[in-house]
Structure formats: structure tokens, C-alpha cells
Amino acid sequence: MRVLPQHRDIVQKLRQLMRELAPDTREVLTYGILAWRANRIVAVLSPTKKDITLAFSRGASFEDKYGLLQGVGKVSKNLKLKDVKEIKKTVVAYYVKQALAADAK
């Protein structure tokens, strides 16, 4: 997975948080992008020129009390991160917990 230098710290932080918040998932490369799998793909991390996208496979069904989920898809929703300072553990944990619950169904 190719990541621009200005986004590497974001990727590193998200990988660290996923290891901590979703220890039973496996980090895998799928179609050249980083993903976390439990029963199915739970989340996908994809770099763009502008930001890093953390997409949740069933994010459209999530509660979104922070109003941060984006995307027009009927199933997947994502967080767009441009700076490591935007990453708040409690916020990521809120969405990851829902992703794991959706995967367990």
C-alpha cells in the first residue's frame, strides 16, 4: 500500500488503534489496501492524495453521534482523516465497536 509521507503518521496511529480496539481482527492486504477482518472485512484503510479514508464495511447502519461518517453508499461509510491530530481514540473506538458488533451478527 502506497502512502504519501505526510499521511504515514495517520496510518501508523490507525493501525495501532485497530490492534488495541479490535485485537481479534486480522490485519490483511486486500486488493492492495489494508483491511481488518474478523468473520468478514470490518474496516478498510485506503490512502488518497488528500487524506486517509477509514471505511467501515457496514457503516451505513451505525449510529453517528459525532456526525463524522461520510459516503453515499447504502452499506459502507467512512472517516476522512487529513492530520494525525484529528484522530481521537474515543471517536475511533465508538465506530470500531459498532463495526465489530455488526460483524458478529
Each predicted region: which residue ranges?
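Charge-dense, helix-prone N-terminal extensions
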Residues: 1-105
